[in-house]
Curated annotation (Swiss-Prot):
Assembly with partners or alone: Acetyl-CoA carboxylase is a heterohexamer composed of biotin carboxyl carrier protein (AccB), biotin carboxylase (AccC) and two subunits each of ACCase subunit alpha (AccA) and ACCase subunit beta (AccD).
Organism expressing this protein natively: Pedobacter heparinus (strain ATCC 13125 / DSM 2366 / CIP 104194 / JCM 7457 / NBRC 12017 / NCIMB 9290 / NRRL B-14731 / HIM 762-3)
Region Disordered: start-end pairs: 1-23
This protein's encoding gene: accD
EC numbers, comma separated: 2.1.3.15
UniProt name for this protein: Acetyl-coenzyme A carboxylase carboxyl transferase subunit beta
Cofactor note: Binds 1 zinc ion per subunit.
Root EC class: transferase
ZnF segments: C4-type: 29-51
Localization (cell): Cytoplasm
Any one Gene Ontology BP term: fatty acid biosynthetic process
Taxon lineage: Bacteria, Pseudomonadati, Bacteroidota, Sphingobacteriia, Sphingobacteriales
HAMAP family, A to Z: AcetylCoA_CT_beta
Keyword annotations from UniProtKB, A to Z: ATP-binding, Cytoplasm, Fatty acid biosynthesis, Fatty acid metabolism, Lipid biosynthesis, Lipid metabolism, Metal-binding, Nucleotide-binding, Transferase, Zinc, Zinc-finger
Keyword Nucleotide-binding: yes
Length: 281
């Protein structure tokens, strides 16, 4: 004879009583794997409160972090890529563009805006890694070029936030042209004596590193960012040697003289405002 008898076979909850967490309410830190509430992430500028890992975010979040009261005027919002080469890999390039636009809500891998940081005017161009790996195509180059022209015309400092896997292979030479195009525009910005600040975030690689990302009057990076040209695996296979510990991290690049500062995202707005005030005076 059983000591206990279960009167009810199981516990059931009516559908009306069930409560589900809304999508996007919780995130997991890629570094320490701890759960992060979206409200805490927003308050902490998308930096893990446990291990200080800087989560990858896009232009929407950077504009939110940097611009006063999240107020800004978006510049050149309707530029979209063509397909002059009729490129097809696993799928047609035009189809890939349409899918990326639907998935991200973006027109391409960059957005540009004019706003204020602690009262100081600033033009910001920010790349989005979620759009085809933040790859640099003709629209990315054109938006940067037009943003620089806008900065020169209105005499406003320019901030470039890079986050990219490099040149967009689907546009071939049209993509590579953007390296020279943006570098030439930055030379005009320098001639006009207008400050250019380059912020390198995780990851900044390929043709972006080899052009505008490293040409700032001040080059800044976020902690732990991957910064380089070719990837570490490709380099290791080429030179047949083990790479130094921490190779291609922001800290390694700073130590070897290619960066001026590493700045925590939570202090970024104040640091940028200080630079702007210093350069204006």
């Amino acid at each position: 004879m059983a000591w206990f008898k279960r009167e009810k076979k199981g516990i059931s909850t009516s559908t009306e009583e069930k409560k589900e967490a809304p999508d996007g309410l919780w995130n997991k830190c890629p570094n320490c794997k701890k759960a992060l509430h979206s409200a805490d992430l927003l308050e902490n500028k998308y930096v893990c409160q446990y291990c200080n890992y800087h989560l990858r975010v896009g232009s929407k979040e950077y504009f939110q972090v940097l611009f006063d009261n999240n107020q800004f005027t978006e510049l050149f919002p309707n530029l979209t890529s063509g397909d002059p080469l009729n490129f097809t890999d696993s799928k047609p390039y035009t189809e890939r563009l349409i899918e990326s636009m639907a998935k991200t809500g973006l027109k391409d891998a960059i957005r540009a805006a004019h706003g204020k940081i602690e009262g100081e005017d600033l033009v910001v161009a920010c790349m989005d890694f979620n759009f085809i790996g933040g790859s640099m195509g003709s629209v990315v180059g054109e938006k940067i070029a037009r943003s620089i022209d806008y900065s020169i015309k209105h005499k406003i400092p320019f901030l470039m936030i890079s986050k990219s896997g490099g040149a967009r292979m689907m546009e071939a030479a049209f993509s590579l042209m953007q390296m020279a195009k943006t570098s030439a525009k930055l030379a005009l910005l320098s001639q006009a004596k207008i400050p250019y600040i380059s912020l390198l975030t995780d990851p900044t690689t390929g043709g972006v590193t080899a052009s505008y990302a490293m040409l700032g009057d001040i080059n800044i990076a976020e902690p732990g960012s991957l910064i380089g040209f070719a990837g570490p695996r490709v380099i290791k296979e080429t030179i047949k040697k083990d790479l130094p510990k921490g190779f291609q991290t922001a800290e390694f690049v700073l130590e070897h003289g290619f960066l001026d500062f590493i700045v925590d995202r939570r202090a970024m707005k104040a640091k940028l405002a200080a630079f702007l005030k210093m350069m204006k005076n």
